[in-house]
């Protein structure tokens, strides 16, 4: 393609959206400079962290060095953590210096809200990194029995900013693992959520099916009560307190801390406001994909890797149109694809604006 001078692209992040952005640029003939900013040149495959407690995956299986990827696609890696943005001067601020850009793709991911009392001290956040999966594995191995509570919440100011699917996988996966080990009878499993219908994004039929499966597996539920506190051995809610020797909780999400100094338009939930083309309104050279963005769409719009990929692809195609001076009319497809894995079987959930499909089978299990 015919690149103009204003085509130095900078990408923030090293996750799904960021890597899809790189691939989409090169696939569509972009041959100019690409710089990717991230703390480490590593892609972490968080979706498979559900298999760490069972030993099916280890850290080295899920942390993929990006050196060859960068070399193959001619990407300059810049080591740093973003601290702010100077959009007037087209500069990204990091703890390792500033990086200038002509076009910017933000794919830095979000962060979990950790404001509830006791959440930092007494809770494992399953998708907060590989270390969380390892901590769960190690603590579970040391337990002779007890109560394990697993749940998720949301961002009250940003309904779409939640990630509940992996918690269902941990619930069913732990049940299966403990049965395999012959010690399920020594443990009580509790699924909890402040939402009366947790997992509603997956569709009403999916929620009913997931809760029915819990009952079948003798997994207790504690639903519809606002959480007040996590203690060392219990969870306190407005509906009462229940014991927990090991607590896994996925809180709602918000944007990264540096957004407060970015000058970008933020939603009530703390994420960058974006349009259906993954562009930031009012900023002609800034695009966004994934968990750090607040996108238009149905209430079930997912915060998941697949959606980040779709947003990155649309955003980059619009970026390339802007560079070429042609109409930028690309919009990301809205769809949810989730395979709820339970170690020995799985449930496929698919949803788009026209349909919702649920399929229970073994075909997707490795």
Language-model features: locations:
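C-terminal, flexible cofactor-proximal segment of oxidoreductases
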Residues: 29, 314-366
């Amino acid at each position: 393609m015919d690149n103009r001078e204003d085509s130095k692209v900078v990408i923030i992040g090293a996750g799904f959206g960021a890597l899809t952005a790189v691939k989409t640029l090169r696939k569509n003939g972009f041959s100019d400079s690409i710089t990717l900013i991230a703390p480490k040149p590593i892609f972490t495959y968080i979706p498979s962290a559900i298999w760490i407690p069972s030993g099916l995956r280890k850290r080295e299986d899920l942390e993929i060095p990006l050196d060859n990827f960068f070399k193959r696609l001619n990407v300059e890696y810049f080591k740093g953590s973003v601290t702010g943005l100077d959009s007037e001067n087209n500069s990204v601020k990091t703890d390792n210096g500033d990086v200038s850009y002509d076009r910017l793709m933000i794919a830095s991911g979000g962060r979990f809200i950790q404001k509830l009392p006791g959440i930092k001290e007494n809770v494992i956040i399953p998708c907060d990194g590989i270390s969380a999966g390892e901590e769960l594995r190690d603590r579970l191995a040391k337990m002779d029995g007890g109560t394990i509570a697993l749940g998720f919440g949301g961002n009250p100011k940003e309904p779409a900013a939640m990630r509940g699917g992996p918690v269902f996988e941990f619930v069913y996966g732990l049940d299966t693992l403990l049965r395999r080990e012959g010690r399920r009878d020594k443990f009580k499993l509790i699924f909890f959520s402040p939402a009366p219908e947790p997992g509603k994004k997956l569709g009403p039929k999916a929620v009913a099916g997931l809760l029915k499966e819990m009952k079948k597996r003798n997994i207790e539920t504690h639903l519809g009560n606002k959480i007040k506190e996590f203690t060392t051995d219990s969870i306190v809610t407005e509906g009462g307190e229940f014991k927990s020797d090991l607590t896994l909780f996925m809180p709602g999400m918000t944007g990264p801390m540096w957004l407060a100094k970015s000058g970008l338009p933020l939603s009530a939930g703390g994420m960058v406001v974006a349009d259906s083309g993954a562009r930031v309104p009012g900023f002609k050279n800034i695009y966004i994909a994934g968990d750090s963005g607040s996108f238009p769409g149905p209430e079930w719009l997912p915060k998941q890797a697949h959606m980040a990929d779709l947003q990155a692809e649309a955003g980059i195609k619009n970026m390339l149109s802007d560079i070429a001076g042609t109409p930028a009319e690309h919009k990301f497809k809205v769809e949810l694809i989730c395979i709820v894995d339970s170690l020995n079987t799985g449930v496929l959930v698919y949803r788009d604006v026209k349909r919702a499909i649920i399929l229970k089978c073994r075909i997707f299990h490795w």
